[in-house]
């Protein structure tokens, strides 16, 4: 089944056909770095991380670019409030963002272009728009003349006449028309500034992404993504600038994530109803946060609550318990010389769930439906292990490989599937279990208890049974 993507531009699902066979070029709007990332930001970047992972899992080579807006009105305002240098403030929060994304197991982009390192590229882009008659210089900067671009509004479906009536227009003294937006802002006293043909100043927000995405991905590329709040004006203005400059369709698939909601309102810094990634990571494993996000389709609103996070935590524990059950069962599993009814049932459940998983992910990356298939395998394999005395290695291996594929796509279970490390760990743990058993035989209970306690601190729990000591991994 081909991958189908919901294209915001057409408001329908379309079969995904990249411009270059086997390769996907993808741009995701990155943060304006003036504060700590919150869960609303994380929702977007986890969603696009999983989309990228799935495309790679399906065999595509993905070139992913995500920008940093490291000069902006918000950065200047925050720097004035704190007394920091705007450059240092942006650098601090840029590093914090990268640290938080790494903690959340979001794979790094291939390129992270920063606005301040692309000023000449931005100036060249604006000059091209001027030469083509789409941009003009006003008293306070350079503006894009919206009404000259005939397709304006095709992404957001906003009509120009409605915009002129005052719907979300940007202020500016030098505008010819109220709907026009800034490409270059002339410097104000005390603000960071760069030399340009129009005097000292800095770029407008929208031109930055048009410039940096096309520099690294070309004048046409496959996927442009971001949050729903970027559809208008940001992405609408990006289309106008880029297609005016290049003279043809710019981006083929526009993808947008739904809002993270708190008590019926969008989580945002302006409303003060946000929880930072760092706050959550103090209380929850990063995989809990990922699973919380993946329990809803990326386009749907996601309601944040402590109960919702706890539900994700419990679900993650269920999956880890299943993995542990498989691992323990592997030690007594036998080669499959014969299958009986329990094996056929387990095999069919795994086979059908794998099919459902890929069908869901091919259908606009529907992680919520895909997760249902994951829990079907979890339930089926646990049921199988209660039905048989000696499980078959082939059944356990198929379940194990399914969870490994899920982990690769969803960014879960990473510690379980670093195989070489896991094998070495298991050999060492088994050796310590044997040493502890010998110590107990010799009545050296203090040392035996010491081994048990130290292993527990490392996430290994020992259980003494009539058949001997078994161990399992736990979250610490």
Curated annotation (Swiss-Prot):
<dbReference type="Pfam" id="PF09190">
    <property type="entry name" value="DALR_2"/>
</dbReference>
<feature type="binding site">
    <location>
        <position position="238"/>
    </location>
    <ligand>
        <name>Zn(2+)</name>
    </ligand>
</feature>
<dbReference type="GO" id="GO:0006423">
    <property type="term" value="P:cysteinyl-tRNA aminoacylation"/>
</dbReference>
<dbReference type="InterPro" id="IPR024909">
    <property type="entry name" value="Cys-tRNA/MSH_ligase"/>
</dbReference>
<keyword id="KW-0862">Zinc</keyword>
<comment type="similarity">
    <text>Belongs to the class-I aminoacyl-tRNA synthetase family.</text>
</comment>
<dbReference type="Pfam" id="PF01406">
    <property type="entry name" value="tRNA-synt_1e"/>
</dbReference>
<dbReference type="InterPro" id="IPR014729">
    <property type="entry name" value="Rossmann-like_a/b/a_fold"/>
</dbReference>
<dbReference type="InterPro" id="IPR015273">
    <property type="entry name" value="Cys-tRNA-synt_Ia_DALR"/>
</dbReference>
<feature type="short sequence motif" description="'KMSKS' region">
    <location>
        <begin position="266"/>
        <end position="270"/>
    </location>
</feature>
<protein>
    <recommendedName>
        <fullName>Cysteine--tRNA ligase</fullName>
        <ecNumber>6.1.1.16</ecNumber>
    </recommendedName>
</protein>
<keyword id="KW-0030">Aminoacyl-tRNA synthetase</keyword>
<dbReference type="GO" id="GO:0004817">
    <property type="term" value="F:cysteine-tRNA ligase activity"/>
</dbReference>
<keyword id="KW-0963">Cytoplasm</keyword>
<dbReference type="GO" id="GO:0008270">
    <property type="term" value="F:zinc ion binding"/>
</dbReference>
<dbReference type="InterPro" id="IPR015803">
    <property type="entry name" value="Cys-tRNA-ligase"/>
</dbReference>
<feature type="binding site">
    <location>
        <position position="269"/>
    </location>
    <ligand>
        <name>ATP</name>
    </ligand>
</feature>
<keyword id="KW-0648">Protein biosynthesis</keyword>
<feature type="short sequence motif" description="'HIGH' region">
    <location>
        <begin position="31"/>
        <end position="41"/>
    </location>
</feature>
<feature type="binding site">
    <location>
        <position position="234"/>
    </location>
    <ligand>
        <name>Zn(2+)</name>
    </ligand>
</feature>
<feature type="binding site">
    <location>
        <position position="29"/>
    </location>
    <ligand>
        <name>Zn(2+)</name>
    </ligand>
</feature>
<keyword id="KW-0547">Nucleotide-binding</keyword>
<dbReference type="GO" id="GO:0005737">
    <property type="term" value="C:cytoplasm"/>
</dbReference>
<feature type="binding site">
    <location>
        <position position="209"/>
    </location>
    <ligand>
        <name>Zn(2+)</name>
    </ligand>
</feature>
<dbReference type="InterPro" id="IPR032678">
    <property type="entry name" value="tRNA-synt_1_cat_dom"/>
</dbReference>
<dbReference type="InterPro" id="IPR009080">
    <property type="entry name" value="tRNAsynth_Ia_anticodon-bd"/>
</dbReference>
<keyword id="KW-0067">ATP-binding</keyword>
<dbReference type="GO" id="GO:0005524">
    <property type="term" value="F:ATP binding"/>
</dbReference>
<keyword id="KW-0479">Metal-binding</keyword>
<keyword id="KW-0436">Ligase</keyword>
């Amino acid at each position: 089944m081909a991958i189908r993507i919901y294209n915001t531009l057409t408001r329908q699902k379309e079969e995904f056909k990249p411009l270059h066979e086997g390769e996907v070029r993808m741009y995701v709007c990155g943060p304006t770095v003036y504060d700590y990332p919150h869960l609303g930001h994380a929702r977007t970047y986890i969603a696009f991380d999983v989309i990228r992972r799935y495309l790679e899992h399906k065999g595509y080579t993905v070139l992913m670019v995500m920008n940093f807006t490291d000069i902006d009105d918000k950065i200047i305002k925050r720097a004035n409030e704190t007394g920091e240098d705007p450059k240092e403030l942006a650098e601090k929060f840029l590093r914090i963002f990268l640290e938080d994304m790494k903690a959340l197991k979001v794979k790094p982009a291939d390129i992270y272009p920063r606005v301040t390192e692309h000023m000449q590229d931005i100036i060249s882009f604006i000059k091209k728009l001027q030469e083509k008659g789409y941009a003009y210089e006003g008293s306070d900067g350079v503006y894009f003349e919206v009404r000259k671009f005939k397709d304006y509004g095709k992404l957001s479906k906003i009509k120009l006449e409605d915009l002129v009536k005052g719907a979300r227009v940007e202020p500016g003294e030098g505008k010819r028309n109220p709907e026009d937006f800034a490409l270059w802002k002339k410097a104000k006293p005390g603000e960071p500034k760069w030399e340009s043909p129009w005097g000292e100043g800095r770029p407008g927000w929208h031109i930055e992404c048009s410039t940096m995405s096309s520099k690294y991905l070309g004048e046409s590329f496959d996927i442009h993504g971001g949050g729903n709040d970027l559809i208008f004006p940001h992405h609408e203005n990006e289309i106008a600038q880029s297609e005016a400059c290049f003279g043809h369709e710019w981006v083929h698939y526009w993808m947008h994530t739904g809002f993270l909601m708190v008590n019926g309102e969008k989580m945002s810094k302006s409303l003060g109803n946000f929880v930072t990634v760092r706050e959550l990571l103090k209380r929850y494993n990063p995989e809990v946060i990922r699973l919380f996000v993946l329990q809803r389709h990326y386009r749907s609103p996601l309601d944040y609550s402590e109960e919702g996070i706890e539900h994700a935590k419990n679900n993650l524990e269920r999956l880890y318990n299943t993995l542990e059950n498989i691992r323990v069962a592997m030690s007594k599993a036998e080669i499959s010389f014969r299958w009986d009814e329990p094996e056929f049932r387990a095999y069919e459940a795994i086979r059908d769930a794998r099919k459902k998983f890929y069908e869901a992910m091919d259908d606009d990356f529907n992680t919520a439906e895909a997760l249902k298939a994951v829990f079907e395998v979890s339930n089926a394999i646990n049921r199988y292990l209660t039905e048989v005395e000696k499980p078959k290695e082939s059944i356990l291996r198929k379940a194990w490989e399914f969870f490994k594929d899920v982990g690769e796509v969803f960014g879960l279970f990473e510690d379980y599937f670093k195989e070489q490390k896991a094998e070495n760990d298991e050999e060492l743990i088994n050796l310590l279990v044997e040493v502890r058993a010998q110590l107990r035989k010799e009545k050296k209970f203090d040392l035996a208890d010491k081994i048990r306690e130290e292993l527990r601190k490392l996430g290994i729990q020992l259980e003494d049974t009539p058949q001997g000591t078994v161990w399992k991994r736990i979250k610490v």
